[in-house]
Amino acid sequence: MRSLLRIFACWCGAALLSLPLVAQQLPDQMSPPRLVNDFAGLLDEAQRRSLEQKLVDFDRETSTQITVVTVDDLDGYAPADYAQRLHDKWGVGRKGKDNGILILVKPSQPDSRGEAYISVGYGLEGVIPDITAGRILDQE
């Protein structure tokens, strides 16, 4: 009985140690960098190009960069954590201003619900605090 308990404890320990390795797969930024990154394939090419142009124009007019990312899977992350990590990894926004916004969309799948999150750079938190970003998602 004790050996069975030890085997079970070792198996649980190995499973727990492997968790951080599973939840590490954030996508690399496309090359050349884009503002619309449709990894889930939700948009057709015309929609993607149209949205990309609108976001480029918005960036040019306001110096605020908005990046849209769609993914099929959050790889074990909570939506907020995934979006923030991706926001940081890609460096969304102007250097020194940290004024970027990352909009994350994970569509529903047969085995999971759809999720979305808006990650706002520190330079914009006074304009778009987390509560406002949450309300935007709730209304849409």
Model-derived features: where do they sit?
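Folded, non-transmembrane soluble domains that reside on the lumenal/extracytoplasmic side of membranes
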Residues: Q24-E140
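Bacterial N-terminal signal peptides
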Residues: I7-P20
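Positively charged n-region of N-terminal signal peptides that target proteins for export
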Residues: M1-R6
